[in-house]
Amino acid sequence: MLYVVRAVKERKPFVDEILKQIPDAVVYYDRFGNAMKSYLHVCKNIIAGEPAVLLEDDIILTSNFREKIEAVISQHPDTLINFFSLSKKYLEPHWKKGREYCMNQCEYFPEGFSLRVVEAYENWPLKEKEPTAYDFLVGYAWGNNNPYLVWCPSLVQHREVKSIINPRRSSKRQSVTFEV
């Protein structure tokens, strides 16, 4: 399984924590100073259509992360899976429609999907309005009629830190279902 961590240099200590559980993960440090450009670069040139787990740098992994995530993926290898949920309503695994907001802290891309994300960006109606909103782009690329799986309990926790992309965002974006 390919694991890719998207990161910025300021978050290297967090990346080092992730690498303790996933030592063979590919770490991509943003070279563009542009979240969307970096995201598309990773999708096109690093994942390049392979099945992969894409992680952000500001997360904490559950214990036995790799064992848990690979067990879920083995049951749903052809499905977009999100491993972080902010929902207080759904405390168990559930399906969401494509085109909805898709949290990007940790997600599994099935074979070929990363290239669909790159292609979808060309026709994405929010490209100008939401230049860093790859969380919406992923749902758009997956499509309206394709539900994706949101796994609960969350296998990652969003750290309580300021967003580098948008410092005005709340740092209080943690999952109630995360288990250490």
Label for each model-derived stretch:
Residues 1-55, 59-180:
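An acidic/histidine-cluster motif and surrounding catalytic segment
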